[in-house]
Amino acid sequence: MKNTNDIAVLIVDDSALMRKVIGKVIEGAPGLSIAGKAMNGRFALDMLERVQPDVILLDLEMPHMNGLQFLEQRKRLRIDIPVIILSSIAKEGARVTMQCLELGASDFVTKPFGSESAHLRTVSRKIVDYVTAYGRRYKLLRRTRRCLAMDTPVERPAGEEDLNCLDTQERASLPSVCARAPARDRASYTITPTEGARQTRIVPLRESGALQIIAIGVSTGGPSALRHIFAQLDADLPQPVVVVQHMPAGFTREFAYSLNQVCALEVKEAQEGDLVRRGRVLIAPGDRHLTVERRSLATVAHINSDEPENGHRPSVDVLFESVARHFENRALGILMTGMGRDGAAQLARLYTEGSRTIAQDADSCIVYGMPRVACELGAVGEQVSLDDMAATINRYGKVFASS
């Protein structure tokens, strides 16, 4: 029997087999249920008011109304139900997926293929994690709207005390210790642990130096978050930017191209030997690690296929480690929304070296996992909301360029 607290999922795909496969994934996950199934976007639009889903899983290629057309109608009708794209790994699928993100889709997962393959198990876990993350956030948003309309307190169902910490391995063991600071004080506050929480206090080895590079790590929720930030970065930002976004192979080139359309800086997928220079943003290629090397005359990017770190390739920790090694106290490390702990350990190293560090705050994260672990380690100098992140980067870049 369906629980009213379940996250209701609408599956939109023209393949009966795919609807069945994904339906089994949803039905097999605790806390999730199927709101309905539709064979194209037109049927999905007709069903929305009746089934009231919390998340929509949307195929791209469908007759009568495809994924792009559905998103265009969703935008026109001002429907804010989160949409997760079910994408193929083909080049054309990657291009259309990025167009979907531009139209307001929240995120994407690659379509399952095969029946008992490791890929199917991996994708199934990702579908469940993404649906849970976006669905819980939307349910809270909808509940908050109802309570505000009735002028009553917002109540969360039992077990949803912290809707942002959805990392399946760590959600029970990582109480939040990052104290929120007033806006006027955010640049200088100290992080204090909550009652009973453990936290390592890091004492930097040296004072922060002149800022020479900005490194960003992000996972779940990252595509739309980075688009939001990059659209607001100043064209005269003095430092180069390097980014790890957890993303499969075949998508990052189109992702970088999409970001380049909205950013005043040059955004490109990193290639071996690329110059890391002012006016440029380098995105780690899917399924490859990105590192930087500071030489006497220039800083260059390196790409490798070493083993995954923290279960990820590209890994934020791998990038941050190289930044800490070559730039010591002259970097800005930023850890944003995402499951797990990738990036937290090496953000702590950056902080220890004297570099400046920022974590996205809990309220604006789709999943408050990676930033939360960094806070537990005492590695965060400032918490910043997504809406304030671009302005903060612009401010850091200019104020600390010659400190």
From Swiss-Prot:
Belongs to the CheB family. Its EC number is 3.1.1.61, 3.5.1.44. This is Protein-glutamate methylesterase/protein-glutamine glutaminase. NCBIfam families: PRK00742.1. The lineage of its organism: Bacteria, Pseudomonadati, Spirochaetota, Spirochaetia, Spirochaetales. Residues 204-393 form the CheB-type methylesterase domain. One of its GO terms (biological process) is chemotaxis. SMART domains: REC. Keywords: Chemotaxis, Cytoplasm, Hydrolase, Phosphoprotein. It comes from Treponema pallidum (strain Nichols). GO terms for cellular component: cytoplasm. PANTHER family: PROTEIN-GLUTAMATE METHYLESTERASE/PROTEIN-GLUTAMINE GLUTAMINASE (PTHR42872), PROTEIN-GLUTAMATE METHYLESTERASE_PROTEIN-GLUTAMINE GLUTAMINASE 1 (PTHR42872:SF3). One of its GO terms (molecular function) is protein-glutamate methylesterase activity. Disulfide bonds: none annotated. The active site is at residues 219, 246, 342. It is an enzyme of class 3 (hydrolase). The modification 4-aspartylphosphate is found at residue 59. It catalyses: [protein]-L-glutamate 5-O-methyl ester + H2O = L-glutamyl-[protein] + methanol + H(+); L-glutaminyl-[protein] + H2O = L-glutamyl-[protein] + NH4(+). The keyword Phosphoprotein applies. Residues 8-126 form the Response regulatory domain. Phosphorylated by CheA. Phosphorylation of the N-terminal regulatory domain activates the methylesterase activity. Contains a C-terminal catalytic domain, and an N-terminal region which modulates catalytic activity. It is found in: Cytoplasm. Involved in chemotaxis. Part of a chemotaxis signal transduction system that modulates chemotaxis in response to various stimuli. Catalyzes the demethylation of specific methylglutamate residues introduced into the chemoreceptors (methyl-accepting chemotaxis proteins or MCP) by CheR. Also mediates the irreversible deamidation of specific glutamine residues to glutamic acid.
